[in-house]
A protein has these predicted regions:
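Short, glycine-/Ser/Thr-/acidic-enriched flexible segments
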Residues: 61-63, 165, 238, 247, ...
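C-terminal amphipathic alpha-helical segment
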Residues: 272-342
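Short beta-strand segments
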Residues: 161, 233-234, 271, 407-409
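N-terminal extension/subdomain marker
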Residues: 1-193, 198-202, 215-221, 228, ...
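Active-site beta-strand/loop microenvironment that shapes enzyme catalytic pockets
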Residues: 209-254
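Catalytic or ion-translocation cores adjacent to nucleophile or general acid/base/metal-coordination motifs
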Residues: 235-303
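Charged substrate- and nucleic-acid-binding regions of tRNA-handling and nucleotidyl-transfer enzymes
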Residues: 352-450
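Non-catalytic terminal and connector segments of soluble metabolic enzymes
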Residues: 347-350
Length: 450
């Protein structure tokens, strides 16, 4: 079987259940609906008394519960039970091409592979083949290590992005797979998750074609320093950083395995998606600041971002101006009892958020406390920031006193890789790849710790 070591990829040995009912077996990524226990209760009802990946994961809504450790032990036992009781078909060495249609009518294409954690680095200014897209919060790794370290099975919700405008890797794999291979699964996903189909990718012809596409993509994504930036982590940054940390810990405890290219702990199962896939939406995550002087903020950002400001008459006009730009920002706030709209125009060439967030962080460090008087009395309160999905919510918040909503421009796919290559991982909450119910669902499994 062909190897793809130089591209940081390995053909995984994939496990699929014998009687695959996608609607009860597959579960949405554990880092979704973190404030919505009701969603996970509904998921439990959907999967009740049936084999399900829900029994193999710990939704992050429960990460701080007192019985977390008991839940992790139960997950391990369930994994062992599924392996012993013949829930799975025999493992098969293959890639899988998938098509995911969401409830929003979008179809996203993906390729399931294993990646070599030796070729991945989450730390800033990495020159690794596989790099993080957003700043990794180190404190989030240890609790996730407790779940992965020693687990008999791995389930992927990580999505890697490939910079492939010619659609050579994922899309071409799909054309060939659908033409000549059996369909592995097809069905609905629970709770409005849409539907999913998967095809085997394993013939020599397919492997040869994938190798050629990776060679071309490597050449096209070679940076000025000579490093190759082949894949960016789109979803699951902290999960992949956790997998890397577990592998580093394992090497320390088992130094004889440090160079073992067959050790399953060295790899992570992921889905590769083309950043240019029309079914993959990139939405900006907007900002809102509380308890600050809006005019002082705009003046400060205008200086730091070397821009110019323009008064805008209506909400619609401001929204359209920002939406049709890649580097302009919209502000909405109350002034003399009326809602005001201001456009900040800049000539930023990289992704706009990579310049805005550091400037906001600087402003918040020095922003004076606001003097507020209400029925509770008078007091000083400090400035705060929050991250908002959707422009409607920004304009609603902009109607509140002492509040400034900031609209961010669309995330430009064509400058995404270049920005990360030049500036390192993006600031926190930079972009969102679709809605919560569009995130990857757990479906395929792989043996991890024996």
């Amino acid at each position: 079987m062909k190897t793809f070591e130089q591209f940081g990829i390995k053909i995984p040995k994939i496990l699929l259940p014998k009687k695959l009912d996608t609607e009860t077996w597959a579960t949405v990524a554990c880092d979704q609906y973190t404030q919505d226990r009701e969603y996970w209760k509904k998921a439990e009802e959907c999967a009740k008394s049936k084999p399900s990946t829900l029994n193999l994961i710990l939704p992050e809504v429960y990460l701080n519960d007192k019985d977390k450790n008991e839940k992790i032990l139960k997950i391990r036992k369930t994994m062992q039970t599924y392996l012993k009781e013949g829930i799975f078909e025999p493992e098969k060495e293959e890639f899988i091409y998938i098509e995911r249609t969401t409830s929003h009518g979008r179809t996203r294409k993906g390729l399931i592979v294993a990646i070599d954690l030796e070729k991945y680095e989450w730390k800033p200014f990495s020159t690794a083949l596989i790099r993080a897209t957003e700043a990794t919060i180190v404190e989030r790794i240890p609790p996730r290590m407790e779940i992965r370290d020693g687990a008999p099975l791995e389930l992927p919700h990580i999505m890697l992005l490939v910079n492939d405008p010619e659609k050579l890797l994922v899309e071409e794999s799909g054309i060939l797979a659908k033409k000549q291979n059996e369909q592995l699964y097809s069905g609905k996903l629970m709770l409005g998750g849409g539907s999913i189909k998967g095809w085997e990718v394993s013939t020599q012809e397919e492997m040869d074609r994938i190798e050629k596409s990776l060679e071309k993509l490597s050449a096209q994504n070679t940076c000025s320093d000579g490093s190759v930036f082949l894949f960016a982590v789109g979803d699951g940054n902290h999960s992949l950083a956790t997998a890397k940390s577990v592998w580093e810990k394992y090497k320390t405890e088992h130094p004889e395995s440090a160079n073992d290219v067959e050790n399953p702990v060295r790899y992570a199962l992921v889905e590769i998606v083309n950043i240019y896939d029309e079914g993959l939406t990139f939405e900006p995550i907007h900002r809102v600041l509380f308890n600050i002087d809006s005019k002082e903020l705009i003046k400060d950002l205008c200086t730091k971002l070397e821009g110019t400001t323009e008064k805008i008459n209506t909400q619609k006009e401001l929204e359209e101006s920002v939406k049709n730009s890649s580097s302009d920002f919209g502000f909405t706030f109350m002034e003399n009892g009326k809602q005001s709209f201001v456009l900040l125009k800049t000539d930023i060439k990289e992704l706009a958020v990579s310049r805005l967030q550091p400037a906001l962080d600087d402003f918040l460090k020095t922003a004076p406390k606001s003097h507020i008087c209400d029925e509770k009395g008078c007091r000083l309160i400090k400035a705060e920031i929050d991250y908002i999905h959707g422009s409607d919510e920004i304009f609603r918040l902009g109607k509140q006193e002492n509040t400034t909503g900031i609209l961010l421009p669309p995330v430009a796919k064509d400058s995404f890789f270049a920005t990360i290559s030049a500036r390192g991982p993006l600031p926190r909450k930079s972009f969102s790849m679709g809605e919560a119910d569009e995130k990857r669902f757990y479906l395929e499994c792989r043996k991890l710790f024996s």
